[in-house]
Amino acid sequence: NVRLIIEPQAAAAAVSNATGADIDAIRHAHDMAQAQDDLDGFEYWDGEFHRLIYSATRNELLMSFEEVLDVIRKRTQWLRIQRAHVTVARRQQYCRQHAEIVSNIANRNTNGAEEAMRQHLVSVLTGMFP
């Protein structure tokens, strides 16, 4: 999965390039995802969380890659897989992982942000494609 290669690097780049406002926005998206009781609301804020990390890189190529990911995420087939495999417990797990990612970005821990994102994506992939 290409996302597993690129997105941890985006998290690492966000450590170096994110402003305080970027970090606040990422944290807000995480908080909003965590507050959702339905999959649609969670999916929206989960997408925002990841989009804001890409945006915080200040890298046009990475931001363009995220736009492609967003189109894929909104396709019917992807949504069907999400609905079948993303349980409440799994959403809670993803939110815990998001908290670790944003904490590492806020603390300017490049290796921590990269590894936390990698672990999160492995968890997502194994959860959706068991």
What are these regions (language model features)?
Residues 90-91, 111:
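Helix-centric, low-specificity signal for extended rod-like, repetitive segments
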